[in-house]
Amino acid sequence: MTNTAPRELIRAIEHVPLTWWFLAVGGAWIVSKIIKILQTAYFSPLRKIPGPWYARLTSARLAWASFANNRIYYVQSLHDKYGSIVLIGPEEVDIADPVAAKQIHRMGSGFVKAPFYKLLSPGPVDNIFNFRDAKLHSTRRKLYAKGFTLNSLRQQWEPTIRNIVALTVERIRHDAQQGEAEILGWWTLMANETVCKLTFNGGHDTVRNGTKDPFVLMLERRMGDLAHLLQHFAPPLYYLGRLLGRAVPRLHDVFFSQETMFEAGKHVVAIARSARDAEGDRNLFVKALAAGDLESKIGGLNDTEIITDAGALLLAGSDPTALSLTYLIWCVLNRPKLQAELESEVAGLQGDITDAACADLPILNAVIYESLRLYGPAPGAMPRSPPPDGATLCGYYIPPSAVVVTQNWSLHGSPKVWKDPHTFDHTRWLPGSSLSEEAKISFNPFGQGARQCLGIHLGWMQLRLATALFFRRCPGAKLAPSTTPESMVMIDSFIAGMPKARRCAIQL
């Protein structure tokens, strides 16, 4: 009897329809998910945090807001209703308190970049911007940091940067005199050429020819294609697509975009290596390449890491600069009195316009600060994972399994911190004006702490030079009829804020 029992059980199992097995496994998975959702909603420490009831059960509403490019507005509406800390998903909390935000992002806080940042790598390995491990990030950052200091940029690169900016302004001026100039496109080309030139000595004549470097084109395609998203959100569909892509050319272009990008990126490494020993055109990858050749145990990079970092630097250094300049020009051209004052200020500069001279112009710098406050290029989510023991923020305990988010759209527009927060008022930044301590720690258009933007000084240099040269060479510029308040509404496009129309045109 005992010996036959297992056999009978096996026969019984063999006769169970396959459909039933799928239903059983699927049902068990659904039940486990429901149990986890209910545990999180009703037993997690996060249950005490204010927020809409549905956020305790699902992130669907938040996901829809992200998909619709209006996450910043949705999250802000929750802050307006529930306060400076709000639950936006079952295990996701958004904070609009400047003191808590500083606690999260300061050096040594224990908070690390959330898993979301895996999406921001164009290659198969982590890069300078999405490392979650603080030590790995620090080691990689040291390879590039010296080249991005303000003194280094002014001594080695300012003439090159100024020439690229000046040519861009002339192209804008020419187009504007012929009809209209689409400035977002031109500023993007300017930033592309600058970053390519500094990082790997590439991007030659991008502005002059009006076309992007092939590596930049492939990078943009890679970061925006379906395969990149499926790889992170639906791996089975991604691998199915790669399998089918071997037989279907159209699918091959989509699902093998990473390989195509790396093929285009081979010239990045080749150009960087060729310039390494040259007395003239050096680049920011010189130290990284040298460390790799010496087989250093600390910091040596292989070709894959070089290409991936080049892609990350281009993503972080191109669109943000272009978008910041676009909104700055739009803000000023909407205010004729301010435009006249700024044109007069830059007209008073003697000789060649230098970054140091621009840094001393009060109106120019006040305009840059205020446009970055209202229309900074990164208005959206900056998610972080808490330390292993969790953290207390705004009086609430946040467990290590949660994700804590801050967004500059809320920090830069808080009525508790800023007077008339939604009004463009450059005078708040002029010498003699007094900003509250909360305002000072709230203003972080380039991030803060150890993860502050590596290229912050390069960004500021381009903003200063481009603003000065534009208003010196294009006095009397005005917005084209196609550029309206509606077309310039900022949308939260995944990793950057941009105009709804994705363009901004001016005339002379």
Swiss-Prot record:
One GO cellular component term: membrane
A GO BP entry: aflatoxin biosynthetic process
GO molecular function list: heme binding; iron ion binding; monooxygenase activity; oxidoreductase activity, acting on paired donors, with incorporation or reduction of molecular oxygen
Membrane topology field: Single-pass membrane protein
Sorted alphabetically, which Pfam families does this protein's record hold?
p450
Q: Which residues are glycosylated?
A: N192, N209, N302, N408
Instruction: Look up the EC number in the record and give it.
Output: 1.-.-.-
Q: Which PROSITE patterns match?
A: CYTOCHROME_P450
Q: Does the UniProt entry include the keyword Glycoprotein? A: yes
Metabolic or biological pathway: Mycotoxin biosynthesis; aflatoxin biosynthesis
Q: Which cofactor does it need?
A: heme
Highest taxon of source: Eukaryota
Q: What does this protein do?
A: Cytochrome P450 monooxygenase; part of the gene cluster that mediates the biosynthesis of aflatoxins, a group of polyketide-derived furanocoumarins, and part of the most toxic and carcinogenic compounds among the known mycotoxins. The four major aflatoxins produced by A.parasiticus are aflatoxin B1 (AFB1), aflatoxin B2 (AFB2), aflatoxin G1 (AFG1) and aflatoxin G2 (AFG2). The role of the cytochrome P450 monooxygenase aflV in aflatoxin biosynthesis has still to be characterized.
This chain's protein is named: Cytochrome P450 monooxygenase aflV
Organism of origin: Aspergillus parasiticus (strain ATCC 56775 / NRRL 5862 / SRRC 143 / SU-1)
